[in-house]
Amino acid sequence: MGDPPPSQAGAAGAGVDLRATEVSLQKIAVWASVSLIAGTAGMLPLDAFDGTGTSTRQIDLPTWMEDPAGDGYGYGDWAYQVLASEMLRGNAVGIIAARGPRGLPTQIVMQHPDEIGVRRDPTTGEVEWRVAGTQIPTSDIWHQRAYPMPGRIQGLSPIGHHAATIGLGLNVLRFGNQFFEDGGHPTAILKTTASLNETAARVAKTRFLAAVSGRREPVVLGGDWEYQAIQIAPEESQFLETHKLTSIECCRIFGPGLAEVLGYETGGALTYQNIQERNIQLLIYALDPWLVRLERALSAMLPRGQYVRINRGALLRTDILTRYRAYQLAIRNRIQAPSEARELEDLPPLTPEQQAEFDSLPSPAPTSDSGGSRA
């Protein structure tokens, strides 16, 4: 028995079929959330380590991890596919195309989530995977799930679980297009004090439209006629309010804080400090759970004792003055070596001549934020 497919939108989102993964991305808030998390994760650098505790040492990242799919598009492209699949369908499935000497995967080609089929044989209990209708040996399947549920092979699909909310949001957009482009309401009223039957009213309307069609000249009306334009604010149809609410809810499907970071829910002036706080909020509440899943998946493909860490510091990169003060504090308290600070700034090691220049300079006086004390 397999897992249930993603459902169609409920009553609120009637007419919207979300069974195709790309349909949900038509909702801008869904697209923005997926793009922000998957895109950001793919841009953050990877570091590999060996050992634990005081014996931990950084090692070279395996060359295959620079392009896990082996298609030339690189790690960032591959990571985007993994996280986008997990965020939209709750699962990321790839085919293991190559293995290393220890039998660990060294090439994984991601598959479109809508082409994946899986079932558990009720007699043998074995799991059967199919990709685009072709059965694939379970040993060749690489599967990661974001929302695991007891008794299910695949994780919950966020899009299927929240189909009504996303469907409502798409219907609101469709209504908005019709409202503003097709004229979802009459644009004006042509009134007269005379009594008109249906035929006379139709003739008057036709003649008026013929008089104003394609012209910018003023229209002359008799004393018995009055033209009144209808101006309906979009708020009166609850278009913007509903659009805003569904956008906020769509963002929250993928993590708290995304609605605020993407600007769907705001409050107060946006300052540099607020931007820094938002980056931290994004990392802690929305992005980090996805980064941890990706780290664990990558670490599982390394020999025992080795693991991968995604460098989150690149996301929280501050202004140059703040960074230099942080380096000074870390170096004075022997948390970080000067060479490490230079490496973080993409600077080469000091040459002997540069080192001599530094040695000839007087020692700087301790500062209030140095964390140390005077000798």
Predicted feature residues:
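Structured, contiguous alpha/beta core segments that scaffold functional sites
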Residues: 1-239, 243-245, 249-252, 264-267, ...
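Generic, well-ordered alpha-helical scaffold segments in large soluble proteins
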Residues: 207-211, 249, 253, 257, ...
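Short acidic alpha-helical/loop segments enriched in Asp/Glu that coordinate divalent cations
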Residues: 220, 258-270, 297-304
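Glycine-rich and small/hydrophobic secondary-structure elements
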Residues: 281
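C-terminal hydrophobic structural anchor segments
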Residues: 284-330
